[in-house]
Amino acid sequence: MKKIGIFGGTFDPPHNGHLLMANEVLHQAELDEIWFMPNKIPPHKQNEDFTDSRHRVEMLKLAISSNSGFKLELAEMDRKGPSYTYDTVRLLKERHPNDKLFFIIGADMIEYLPKWYKLDELLTLIQFIGVRRPGYHIETPYPLLFADVPEFDVSSTMLRERLKAKEPTQYLMPDKVRQYIEENDLYES
């Protein structure tokens, strides 16, 4: 039985903060693997524009390529419509019935758990790992495991803005991702 952490996100673009968080959770929770799972249409971001799925997947492949504990899971990319965690987890449990699945969420998402689609059913299928960050006070009635991650103040939104303004992004994202973005003229407008 493998212990697998599922790390969902738009990863638009993936950055070193994502990698730092995943690596800390991998070790603190003693997981075998972290599966990076890009969302196609996150329910809480349905009115936003995203970079083409193909580019986000390619950037993510490049970002995680140097860590053997990191894998890519495309279950949500293969589906139509909003990406509800409950539906995805049911599918992954069917595909991997002997593995123990953990779903990784940031401190900012913990307060939104009561609004998650079919949360009570989801809690019977998976264990959540909440990532604590400085500045967030976390209180929740839900049975979460916690991981502490050093503060690394970077976001995909900030990177898109820096890229658009032609500001430096070195050390904020993997060099391979930065090169892919430049070669494919992403985030310029």
From Swiss-Prot:
Top-level enzyme category: transferase
InterPro entries in the record: Cyt_trans-like, NadD/NMNAT, Rossmann-like_a/b/a_fold
Tagged with keyword ATP-binding: yes
UniProt keyword annotation of Nucleotide-binding present: yes
One GO biological process term: NAD biosynthetic process
EC numbers, comma separated: 2.7.7.18
Reaction equations catalysed: nicotinate beta-D-ribonucleotide + ATP + H(+) = deamido-NAD(+) + diphosphate
Keywords attached to this entry: ATP-binding, NAD, Nucleotide-binding, Nucleotidyltransferase, Pyridine nucleotide biosynthesis, Transferase
Superkingdom of origin: Bacteria
Pathway(s) it belongs to: Cofactor biosynthesis; NAD(+) biosynthesis; deamido-NAD(+) from nicotinate D-ribonucleotide: step 1/1
Gene Ontology MF terms in the entry: ATP binding; nicotinate-nucleotide adenylyltransferase activity
NCBIfam families in the record: cyt_tran_rel, nicotinate (nicotinamide) nucleotide adenylyltransferase, PRK00071.1-3, PRK00071.1-4
Function: Catalyzes the reversible adenylation of nicotinate mononucleotide (NaMN) to nicotinic acid adenine dinucleotide (NaAD).
Alphabetized PANTHER family for the sequence: NICOTINATE-NUCLEOTIDE ADENYLYLTRANSFERASE-RELATED, PHOSPHOPANTETHEINE ADENYLYLTRANSFERASE
Family classification: Belongs to the NadD family.
Protein name per Swiss-Prot or TrEMBL: Probable nicotinate-nucleotide adenylyltransferase
Organism for this UniProt entry: Bacillus velezensis (strain DSM 23117 / BGSC 10A6 / LMG 26770 / FZB42) (Bacillus amyloliquefaciens subsp. plantarum)
Gene designation per UniProt: nadD
